[in-house]
Amino acid sequence: MSPPRPRASLSPLTLLLLLGGCLLSAAGRDKGAAGREVTRASRPTVGSSGRFVSPEQHACSWQLLVPAPGTPTGGELALRCQTPGGASLHCAYRGHPERCAATGARRAHYWRRLLGALRRRPRPCLDPAPLPPRLCARKTAGSDLHSPAHPSLPARPSEPPRSRARSPARSRQSVRSPSSQPEKKPLLVKSNSGGRKAGSDPVPEPPAAAGFQPNGLDQNAELTETYCTEKWHSLCNFFVNFWNG
C-alpha cells in the first residue's frame, strides 16, 4: 500500500486576496453600468414619427424627441417641410407635458393632441403662434408648444407690373368714338342768287328738253316699215323723214 498524500491547504491570506479581487471587479462593472445609464438619461430618445400634408399643400415629416424616463425636461417635435414651390423648411416645437395637470403620466396623449393641431395649420413652419393644448383645463406656463425659430421662404424675383387688359366694352367705345370717325363734308347747293350754300340734299339734275328725242330716227324707221311698201320704199322714206323733220 502506498502512503497517503498530504492535502494542500490554502492560507487565510490567499483567501483574502481572492475575495478582494472579486469585489473590485464587481464594483467596476456596476460603475460602468451606472455611467451608461446616466448618458442615456441625458440624451432624448427618438419617439414616433410620421408624415402629413397641410391645407396649403406643405408636405411635412415629423419626429418626436422625448427625454428618457425619470428626467422631466420636456420634449421636442422636429419638423421638415417642403413648400409647393420646392423650398425646404426646418423647424422644431418644444413643450413640457409634465406642466399640464390633465396629462399627468399620459405624455403620448399630450403629443397626439398637439400633433393634430399642427396638421390643421396651413404653414406649420411659418406660423409663429404657439400651439395650446386643449386637454389642459387651466393654461399653465410652459404647457404650450413653442417654435424657437421660424424660417422664412426664399425671396422671389420681382415681376414687372403687368398692364391691365382693356375690357371689350372700353375697346368698342374707343373704336366708335366720334373723334376717330372721318368728318363728312357738307354738300354745296347753288342758290338762286348765284352763291353756294351748304346742304345735306344732293343737287337735282335738270330735266331733259321736251323737243329732244334721242330715239327719233328709230321711230321714223318704224313708220316707214309700217306704211310704205317695198316698191315705193325709198320715196316714202323720204317723205316720212321730211315730215318728221
UniProtKB/Swiss-Prot annotation:
Keyword annotations from UniProtKB, A to Z: Disulfide bond, Growth factor binding, Heparin-binding, Secreted, Signal
Tissue specificity remark: In the adult, highly expressed in brain with lower levels in ovary. In the embryo, highest levels are found in the brain and spinal cord at 14 dpc and expression is almost completely restricted to the brain by 18 dpc. In the adult and postnatal brain, highly expressed in the orbitofrontal cortex where it is concentrated primarily in differentiated neurons.
Organism (species): Mus musculus
Role, per record: Heparin-binding protein which binds to FGF2, prevents binding of FGF2 to heparin and probably inhibits immobilization of FGF2 on extracellular matrix glycosaminoglycans, allowing its release and subsequent activation of FGFR signaling which leads to increased vascular permeability.
Lineage: Eukaryota, Metazoa, Chordata, Craniata, Vertebrata
Region ranges (Disordered): 33-52, 136-216
A molecular function (GO) term: heparin binding
Pfam families: FGF-BP1 (PF06473)
Protein's cellular compartments: Secreted
Descriptive protein name: Fibroblast growth factor-binding protein 3
Subunit field text: Interacts with FGF2.
Extent of the signal sequence: 1-28
GO terms under cellular component: extracellular region
Homology family: Belongs to the fibroblast growth factor-binding protein family.
A GO BP annotation: positive regulation of ERK1 and ERK2 cascade
SS bonds (residue pairs): 60-81, 91-125, 228-236
